[in-house]
Amino acid sequence: TDNDNQNKTDDDNQNNEIIVETSKEEDKKSVKENWLEATRRIAKAKRKDKMRDDRDAFLKAYDELKGKEGSNAWIAKSTLGYKGLDIKVSDNAQKLLEFVDKMKGSWVIQKYLEDPMLTDGRKFDVRTWHLVTAFGPKKMHMFTYAEGVLRVSCTRYRNSNFDDEFTHLTNNAIQQGHPDYGKHEKNNLLDFKDLDVILSKHYKSLKGVEIKNYPRKDRPMTTENDILPRINEIVLETLKSIKDWLLPQPTQAYHLLGYDFMITNTGSVQLIEVNLTPGTSPDRLARMVSDMAEIVLDNPFVDPFKMSGSAAADHDLDRKPNSRSSNLFRYSGVVEV
């Protein structure tokens, strides 16, 4: 649990540019692996000649889904949005494009996830933090912070009435405006222990064909054994797509990223958003910075201009940093640069 400042700090300057780049590079694989809903970039009309614009692809995808099961809802959000501001959910494609064209900057339109796993009938998302380090010319290492949070909406979920932001947007900055904010859980936040309870309850509620399509058929999924490993796989895939964009000169560099996920009613982990400047509570931030510093400063400095080629390749730059057992950043994988 977090202090009362959590609602002011867990929402952050979200940058969906990573989602855009990931969808561009990994679109076919994402659909196949089922971890990223269809995502399209919408450029301002006067900048179409200079910026990728996918509105035709969006309209085609929208038409293909029309009449199929579900409401065919999509969500529009700025690539530089934050705190849930200027987000629109709608099942009307033209209204979404009209909304975007009235706004400034570059936008993305993403298929809205209509069948989320719920807690007491309410929607939630999962925020995780990931430290990416690059201390040599070959690889980026990724570490996952062990304490994630669940952000929960105030009202019961309905796959309709998409203008009701208290139902469909879990951002704390949005939810704190509802009279029931904090009624069900402090600051509308839960932790990974709570997620295990949710997963267990959900498993017990499955029937027939539902359990046939569930990732685990012998037991409930758990955060440690099922959700976090899948999250780490997805994060590593996104880093492969944007490694040159994120760390164009990856020597002696690091970056902290915040990822937002949702879990579907069938147990699938879905990437929703990536944040370049993720926020958190002051208490967690202090612990996080201390743990980050230990990992970042543990690596030896190597001047890339004095060491190159085989010397750099042979140097122990790729080693897993030593850290105290209480460090909450857990080593989660490597990406070739």
Which residue ranges define each predicted feature?
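Eukaryotic N-terminal low-complexity, Ser/Thr- and Lys/Arg-rich leader segments
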Residues: 14-19, 28, 329-337
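A donor-sugar binding/catalytic signature common to diverse glycosyltransferases
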Residues: 260
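Intrinsically disordered, low-complexity serine/threonine-rich segments
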Residues: 7-9, 22-23, 30
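Asparagine/serine/threonine-enriched low-complexity, disordered tracts
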Residues: 3-16
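Non-catalytic terminal/accessory segments
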Residues: 313-337
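Catalytic core of tubulin tyrosine ligase-like
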Residues: 28-32, 38-256, 264-268, 275-277, ...
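Hydrophobic/aromatic hotspots within intrinsically disordered, low-complexity regions
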Residues: 18-20, 35-36, 42, 317, ...
